[in-house]
C-alpha cells in the first residue's frame, strides 16, 4: 500500500533552511526512500540524508519529508499533488 508524503523543498543559507523560496509537494510512494526517489526524478536533483532533512549534492537546497497529515497540511498550496 502506498503512503502520501508531504515534502518541502527550500534554499539554504549558512547550512540552514532559509525559506526565501519554497515548493511543497504531496507524493505517493511505498516508502520514505521511494518518496525521495520520486522527488529526485521530478526535480532533477540528487538528495542525501542529513538526519531529519535531505540535502542536495550542492548543499544549496534541502528537503523536509514527513507523512502527509490532512488536518495539518491541507491548507498549503502544492506544486505537485499525487492525492488525485
Please give the residue ranges for each predicted region.
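Generic structural motif
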Residues: 10-12, 30-32, 71
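A short, exposed loop/beta-hairpin motif centered on an aromatic-Gly-Thr core
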Residues: 18-33
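N-terminal cationic leader/targeting segments used for protein routing and processing
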Residues: 3, 29-31, 58
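Short aromatic-glycine-(Arg/Gly/Cys) micro-motifs in beta-strand/loop hairpins
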Residues: 1-22
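Short, mixed-charge low-complexity intrinsically disordered segments
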Residues: 45-84
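Short amphipathic, charge-patterned alpha-helical segments
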Residues: 35-40
Amino acid at each position: 500500500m502506498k503512503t502520501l508524503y508531504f515534502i518541502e523543498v527550500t534554499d539554504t543559507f549558512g547550512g540552514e533552511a532559509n525559506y526565501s523560496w519554497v515548493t511543497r509537494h504531496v507524493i505517493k510512494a511505498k516508502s520514505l526512500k521511494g518518496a525521495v526517489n520520486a522527488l529526485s526524478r521530478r526535480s532533477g536533483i540528487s538528495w542525501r540524508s542529513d538526519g531529519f532533512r535531505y540535502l542536495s549534492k550542492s548543499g544549496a537546497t534541502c528537503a523536509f519529508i514527513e507523512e502527509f497529515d490532512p488536518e495539518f497540511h491541507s491548507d498549503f498550496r502544492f506544486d505537485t499533488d499525487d492525492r488525485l
